[in-house]
């Protein structure tokens, strides 16, 4: 079973997404955070338990790429999916340059989100 870490500041979205992932037979949410500070603590405490991180970009106390930078600086190769409402023509390239593996809009379907997660867990870009 793949263990997922969620960083999302909107509680209702984070809880709904965690519930969705928890209903999948191959996925388990092992940590959740609603802010960059909380995410840094959770990631440090549970680094060995995380198989994939789903990271929101725009947070009340920073940008999700700061957590990605921290993970990469610590030598983590855990795949990272940025799931955001932000838009921009160069956003995918930018988040990848910051260490993320893929970017997906929060407007994506549930099937697209689950497919992207499973693709990244298999070691490929979505």
Where are these regions (language model features)?
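The feature encodes the CheY-like receiver
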Residues: 60, 88
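Active-site residues of response regulator receiver
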Residues: 56-57, 84
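Conserved acidic carboxylate
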Residues: 8
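Acidic catalytic/metal-coordinating carboxylates
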Residues: 35, 63-66
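C-terminal output helix
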Residues: 90, 108-121, 125
């Amino acid at each position: 079973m793949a263990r997922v870490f969620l960083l999302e500041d909107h509680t209702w979205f984070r809880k709904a997404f965690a519930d969705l992932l928890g209903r999948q037979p191959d996925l388990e949410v092992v940590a959740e955070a609603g802010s960059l500070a909380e995410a840094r603590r959770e990631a440090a405490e549970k680094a060995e338990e995380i198989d994939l991180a789903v990271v929101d970009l725009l947070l009340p106390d920073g940008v999700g790429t700061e957590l990605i930078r921290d993970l990469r600086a610590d030598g983590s190769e855990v795949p990272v999916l940025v799931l955001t409402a932000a838009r921009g023509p160069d956003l995918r390239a930018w988040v990848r340059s910051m260490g993320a593996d893929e970017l997906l809009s929060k407007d994506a379907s549930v099937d697209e989100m689950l497919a992207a997660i499973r693709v990244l867990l298999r070691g490929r870009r979505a």
